[in-house]
A protein has these predicted regions:
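Conserved N-terminal segment of class I S-adenosyl-L-methionine
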Residues: 2-133, 232-253
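S-adenosyl-L-methionine-dependent methyltransferase catalytic module, highlighting the catalytic core
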Residues: 3, 15, 23-37, 152-162, ...
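Hydrophobic beta-strand segment of the Class I
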Residues: 95, 139-143
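Short catalytic micro-motifs in class I SAM-dependent methyltransferases
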Residues: 146-150
């Protein structure tokens, strides 16, 4: 199964993957029913989660029902437990909307919810993150997760995120990050898909962020809280929800 998943991820275009997943999800969820692991997003339990990864596959990380990964479940728990995201009126901009969140967020009556991406079939607005068609100070919350590692000019993208965020608002900009690396590594001469996968971890990534990612955001003007949220969750729940211990959520305030 791991080989099949890896082949599909690396050969099927992402917009088509999203469409195909609507057929596959109910079948996978029914086949893997159990009570060992739980997806906190929809509360469903399974005997195992699925493997996932464009390069090296991680075992037991992809929820069959919502298609959430470790980072999605962690973010869900943070938003649910530590913010008023689900209750207070908010204008939200969501980049590259994840299927795990899309329908839930779309149906929240308290949110004025807009999605954006260049290619996703779930995007309301087709837009370049480096040249957004939104006015200054437009959004209370911006979600932009696992996007910046794809963007050659990530500084410009960060400036645009800062521009459209309202003063007093917050953004969450998760990225794949090597916290053992002090300085971000990027090399614009690496354009081959196989080389990028080997060096950056995925065929369409252009860098590996280090611990200096947080300073990059601060240099733009954000006030950044580096939240290690798994430390606040009981170890048995970290295991049951299949979270990644030590994963940092960057909460960015304007």
């Amino acid at each position: 199964m791991k080989k099949i998943f890896k082949a599909v991820l690396n050969t099927v275009p992402r917009p088509l993957l999203i469409r195909l997943s609507y057929v596959a999800r109910p079948i996978l969820a029914a086949a893997l029913q159990g009570n060992k692991f739980t997806d906190p997003i929809d509360g469903k339990s399974f005997r195992t989660f699925l493997p996932y990864g464009y390069g090296k596959q991680r075992n037991n990380v992809l929820s069959p029902s919502t298609l959430s990964l470790e980072r999605h479940r962690l973010l869900w728990l943070y938003l649910k437990n530590e913010t008023d995201f689900f209750t207070a009126p908010k204008k939200v901009l969501h980049f590259a909307p994840e299927q795990a969140f899309y329908k839930v967020f779309r149906n929240l009556k308290n949110l004025e919810y807009t999605t954006t991406d260049l290619n996703s079939p779930l995007a309301d607005v087709k837009a370049d993150i480096c040249n957004l068609p939104f006015a200054n100070d437009s959004y209370d919350v911006i979600l932009c997760n696992h996007v910046l590692e794809h963007i050659p000019d990530d500084k410009r993208a960060m400036q645009e995120l800062y521009r459209v965020l309202k003063p007093g608002g917050f953004g969450i900009f998760q990225i794949p990050q090597d916290l053992n690396r002090e300085v971000t590594f990027e090399d614009n001469s690496i354009t081959d898909a196989k080389a990028r996968a080997e060096i950056f971890g995925q065929y369409d990534h252009v860098r590996v962020y280090g611990h200096d990612y947080f300073e990059k955001l601060r240099d733009i003007g954000f006030k950044v809280s580096e939240v290690d949220y798994t430390k606040t969750i009981a170890p048995e729940l970290v295991e049951r929800y299949c979270l990644a211990p030590g994963e940092i959520i960057p909460i960015c305030y304007k």
